[in-house]
Regions:
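Charged, gly/pro-rich active-site loop segments
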Residues: 1-10, 82-175
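Short, basic/aromatic recognition patches
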Residues: 2-29
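A generic local structural motif
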Residues: 14-17, 41-42, 60-62, 111
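Alpha-helix boundary recognition
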Residues: 20-24, 68-69, 107
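Short beta-strand segments
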Residues: 25-59, 65-67, 73-78, 85-87
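Short beta-turn/strand-loop junction motif enriched in small, turn-promoting residues
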Residues: 33-35, 72, 111-112, 131
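A short local loop/turn or secondary-structure capping micro-motif enriched for an aromatic residue
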Residues: 49-50, 62-65, 93-94, 141-143
């Protein structure tokens, strides 16, 4: 993998970039597992509502069956260089019982409303517990940007902060 010229982003920038991608992107790979049948992965459309990822799948799909048995999932946006992985537990909502405006926002984003289709669909809501983001080898260190459902923020250290005419110089630099 070519990593020459990659500048390692700070945590706050990674969080900003991750949130932007969650708002603007359309597709996510959803990895589930069944205790008896093993792992399963499928691409789905998704909606980020500011707190959770919403997806929709057939009510009898392998994905739906898996999350009913084992709700832990991993989501991955489909860029292998600008990696974004989300881990959480999927909550299941029948298509006519989706809380809030999530189903309507989903329909507006994609021009498709599963609630009016023949057959039954299941909405999956995943509130992130862990998020990892990195671009190439230089960003592997520090790739966790959310832990236990809380976004991490990097506090700038004195060594990282630019000195200006308005900032007092540390005493050891004035000698």
């Amino acid at each position: 993998m070519e990593t020459t010229g990659i500048v390692r982003r700070r945590t706050a920038e990674r969080v900003r970039d991750a949130l932007e991608r969650l708002v603007t992107e359309r597709d996510v790979w959803v990895a589930t597992a069944h205790p008896d049948h093993g792992p399963h992965q499928v691409p789905l459309w998704f909606l980020w509502d500011g707190h959770a990822v919403w997806m929709c799948t057939g009510a009898t799909s392998v994905t739906a069956r898996n999350v009913r048995k084992e709700p832990r999932v991993r989501l991955a946006l489909p860029d292998t260089f600008d990696v974004l992985l989300v881990q959480g537990e999927a909550e299941c909502f029948p298509d006519q019982e989706v809380p809030g405006g999530a189903a309507q926002e989903f329909a507006e984003k994609f021009g498709w409303d599963p609630r009016v289709e023949e057959g039954s669909f299941l909405y999956l809501r995943v509130v992130p517990r862990t998020v990892r983001a990195w671009r190439g080898e230089p960003e592997l260190r520090g790739r966790v940007i959310m832990r236990d459902g809380m976004w991490l923020e990097q506090r700038p250290s004195l060594a990282d902060a630019p000195l200006s005419d308005h900032d007092p110089q540390p005493e050891h630099l004035n000698s």
